[in-house]
Amino acid sequence: MEHCDIAIVGAGMVGAATACLLAAQGLSVRVIETRLPESYDPAQPLDLRVSAISQASVALLEQAGAWQYLQQMRLCPYRRLETWELDGFATRFNAADLGLPQLGYIIENRLVQLALLKRMEDFPNIQTHTPAAVLSLRQSTDDVMLQLDDETTLSARWVLACDGAESHTRKLAGIGVSRFEYRQHCMLINIDTEFAQEDITWQQFTPSGPRAFLPLPGQHGSLVWYDSPARIRALAAMSNEALTAEVRRHFPARLGGFTVMAKGSFPLVRRHANDYHAGRVVLLGDAAHTINPLAGQGVNLGFKDVACWADLLHSAGTGWHKPELVTRYERRRRPDNLLMQSGMDLFYGAFSNEIGPLKLARNLALNMADKAGPLKEMALRYALGLV
């Protein structure tokens, strides 16, 4: 049997970031991953899966030592954010209002993962098992024993489940999850644009769902189209040429000239684990919670989990293995994750109907929010993870 301090299941963005931060504390780390991503080539088309990486997440990536590698690939800073339903009733945010150089960056998920995996190579105390998966786990008071499908038997003081929304580790640990399926699906559409993109991301609410635009490097962008499952299935079946015409009909004219290059779709599901731990198995990121992607906060919440767990272990010093740490972790992270989930659900519910008085009220609210001064700044700082 092999032994380590920390076993991390999943080498995605959350798992790889956790590995880097804990290895930097001198802990021995094993990372178990079924499949590594394709390596980066600047000639590759941009991936569909992107994230709006907040300033707090940038700071975490810098702390992990991965930001230097990301800067050698491709990313797109955004400095302004705008959201509206009716013309003239908009809320606008600007990095300059907070004295920041940008609100964050739009980055392909795979590139964030690759930068973190590259950083992992710098640590002699990180060992990766790939391709490998956990077949079983058995807990005792002081450790967890894992049986992997590469015939490795591994014991660890902590097992961190970072293996995503359908976490197999969570199931093996016997942790239940509450689940809610929204009445919408989401389509991601990568476009080539007529002109190089500016530093703004925007979102318009419509009766059938939001329409959003995220800038990507150069003359590229990402569109996000929320609609009924049947409508999204119909859009997914269209040729790129037909979809281009459909987007022109249903997105704001400010989008300008563009051509659809790639598309994909998925259902919208909110999940929240009933517990963030079972014994010495701890959930981080999507294994613990997923939210409506309206504000692009998914991975940022995951990185806040990572920062919290790393801080708890660091603060504990030689007591990093004590079982009471999991209670502190859940006490810190569950309320914040629940608040963000509830906030996204509030937006979803408020903007998903055509009741006249409510429509007027929500547009007035957007307009008032734009003029709210300190409250607006506080909300933005919270969304960016700066408070």
Where are these regions (language model features)?
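Conserved Rossmann-like nucleotide-cofactor binding loop
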Residues: 14, 37, 166
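Glycine-rich FAD pyrophosphate-binding loop
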Residues: 23-46
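FAD/FMN-dependent oxidoreductases across multiple families
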Residues: 231-321
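C-terminal helical "tail/cap" subdomain of flavin- and related membrane-associated enzymes
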Residues: 311-387
